[in-house]
């Protein structure tokens, strides 16, 4: 009489385990993909959110210097620099200065691309104490635009700012002796295209 092998059905517990593992792996892959995408989207979203809400010590922007004379009161301004995911070195030329309230001051940061190819970054920024953000005003800043550095390039980047005179009128700032301006450079995956140079003559000056 021929031997007969019993029918063995797959273990339902094992099948459930395999299905669960596949689901977990899919979720983990999705989370990693979202995290990678978020890292590149972080700077524009962060800047937009902070400008819109005033969150996290976001500074103000002005086109011109204040019309009033600087006040007698002074405050120390410290400069902080950080890099996240870029082959750059990034340092302030001065770590700390003292400025009068309402005085326009230009500070410089130095950045070097240590990679063997061009890279692009953009800086996120804030000031602390966070409540000072509404008084700390920038007229010009490298953080307003993307920065593309050639291989080995070093660049000096200015930031022109002042502390609004209304800072001194707010009693909550009486104890504030030091303001820290902090920048963190993040990589830009797809830099904005540079405009092509125009071949049309400059109508303001005519042909030279």
From Swiss-Prot:
Similarity-based family: Belongs to the COX11/CtaG family.
Protein name: Cytochrome c oxidase assembly protein CtaG
Chief location category: membrane
Keywords (A to Z) from UniProt: Cell inner membrane, Cell membrane, Copper, Membrane, Signal-anchor, Transmembrane, Transmembrane helix
Highest taxon listed in the record's lineage: Bacteria
Keyword set includes Magnesium: no
Periplasmic compartment residues: 43-208
